[in-house]
Regions:
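Glycine/GP-enriched mid-protein hinge/lid loop-to-helix segment characteristic of carbohydrate kinases
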Residues: 2-10, 24-27, 34-36, 44-48, ...
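Hydrophobic "anchor" residues
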Residues: 31-32, 80, 87, 156-157
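A secondary-structure boundary/capping signal
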Residues: 75-76, 91, 142, 192
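Conserved phosphate-binding loops in N-terminal lobes of ATP-dependent enzymes
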Residues: 6-76
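Conserved A3 ("GATE") glycine/threonine-rich loop of ANL adenylate-forming enzymes
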Residues: 19-20, 120, 144-147
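Residue-level recognition of specific faces of alpha-helices
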Residues: 22, 73, 79, 120, ...
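Glycine-rich phosphate-binding loop and adjoining helix at the ATP-binding site
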Residues: 46-54, 58, 62, 68-72, ...
């Protein structure tokens, strides 16, 4: 692709989900220049996921002129510890305890911004989607896991532990299925994709 100058502003976004990973390259006006979706290799572990993300970023960046600049952001199904920068609270548990941000920056040689995927989704809806114009927006993600984000006055409210909107780990059944967070009967164990799949297996002995 060609650009009008050597400093062509663009943005690469990665949605790192429990089931799939998607890469998107946007021009300055928001036009989609590149989109790719691949399975998240979480059964293969952290290094495989790291390689998958880095490879997809390189694919997207290859669509730009060699001298073009871009920003890079990644939404993850968890959060980064504000003290040590390690991943925590992730439903893809192989990410937990790893320095995803610094590892990707080392592999790519490029600054990386990492945020909770539900927070990213909620902020987008707040500023340019269904929540535009509202003072308080609560966004819900229901996929492999079950996440949530809160925006007030156009800003994400993460809370001191960066999990303010994470409604998926409220226990609604103390005797329910065990969750990876060590609690029982979390909302996520009941209505997320993985929760529904597990419930079907318990009841019918078959995998969806």
């Amino acid at each position: 692709m060609e650009a009008g100058n050597n400093e062509w502003p663009a943005a690469i976004g990665i949605d790192l989900g429990g089931t799939k990973t998607e890469a998107l390259l946007l021009s300055a006006d928001g036009s989609v220049l590149f989109r790719r979706r691949r399975p998240t290799p979480r059964e293969e572990g952290y290094e495989a996921i790291l390689g998958r993300v880095a490879g997809m970023v390189r694919e997207a960046a290859a669509e730009l002129p060699p001298s073009a600049s871009y920003t890079l952001g990644i939404g993850i199904p968890g959060s980064l510890d504000p003290v040590n920068g390690l991943v925590r609270n992730a439903n893809s548990t192989c990410l937990i305890g790893h320095a995803l941000k610094s590892d990707l920056e080392r592999l790519l040689g490029h600054p990386v911004r990492v945020r909770n995927d539900a927070d990213c989704f909620t902020l987008a809806e707040c500023r340019a989607g269904a929540g535009k114009g509202y003072g308080l927006v609560f966004g819900i993600i229901m996929g492999t896991g079950c996440g949530g984000g809160i925006c007030m006055d156009g800003q994400v409210r993460e809370g001191p532990h960066r999990i303010a909107g994470e409604w998926g780990h409220y226990s609604v059944d103390p005797q329910g299925a065990e969750c990876y967070c060590a609690n029982r009967g979390c909302v996520e164990t009941l209505i997320s994709g993985s929760g529904v799949e597990a419930a079907f297996f318990r009841d019918f002995g078959e995998r969806l």
